[in-house]
Amino acid sequence: MKRVSIIIVTYNSEKDIYDCVDSIRSHADIPKEDIELIIVDNCSREPEPMFARLRQQWGEDIVLIENTQNGGYGQGNNVGIRRATAPVILIMNPDVRLMDPFFARPLKAFEEDSGLIMYGMKQMYTETLPSRNSFWFTTMMNGYLRTLLTGLCTRMDWYLPRWMYISGSCFFVRKSMFEAVGLFDEEVFMYGEEDDIHYRLMQRFGLGFRYDKSIRYIHLMLGRQPDIRYEEKLLDVDLYHHKKKGRPAIKTLTTYLQINTTLLARGYLMKLFGKCDHDNFAMLKAFRQVIKSKLKKS
């Protein structure tokens, strides 16, 4: 029986997937026979050449699935999870690169603790530069407090499972528990699924979430420019998820406005010292108008 099933969803991901798979092989501290690697392709232009190279790279036991539709990141992952045979799932983005011996400690934790739900690791931008995105506070709270606590806990590497969700770019989760709460919500095409997954798992199974800062992975996000369309998607996804939970839109929008106010205040302060990221500052100002417009309509 396999100990872990790795699910990677691809969409025209040739520039990323081969190095991703190489990093799995390089940092696997358990026998390859214990690993089930599942690639779900979401209707790329030409998946067959990629599949052929992946078979050569990993071996004939790799599971390659051509999705019948591009239903989004969550839907693609659900296809892979339903096909998986191991009790523990590792969700990975194709632009993730493993760094450290990666599997033995988390899998031992799942095998020894039946209440363990999810296991997250430390996200890096490069081998030496930590990311600020290993975990985040839920947006179902005061926005000023969320921004301040996120900054503090990120700096100190403190993870508080009741209020914080682990990055969705790379995490282990117990398959049976994830299935019990319905897996990824397929109404969301991409982005912003982590808070909802954390909420549903916590409501059903409690606080069995663990963060291990000694195990690291690189997420190739460094250098990406601020994008107001991305921020709008995150807001719309939160509005959708919070509506499911009975939280009024005005509360979610107020939280976002509070977060934006705090970040803009920091931006103005940085301008005084000549250290302002002008692109990010401009995006924050534009996003503020988006939030205010939605507030007027709510």
Please report, for each region that a protein language model flagged, where it lies by residue.
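Short aromatic/hydrophobic "clamp" motif used to bind/position activated sugar donors
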Residues: 89
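A short, conserved alpha-helix in the catalytic core of glycosyltransferases
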Residues: 158, 164-183, 187-215
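Acidic donor-binding segment of Leloir-type glycosyltransferases
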Residues: 21-66
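Conserved donor NDP-sugar-binding/catalytic core segment of glycosyltransferases
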Residues: 101-134
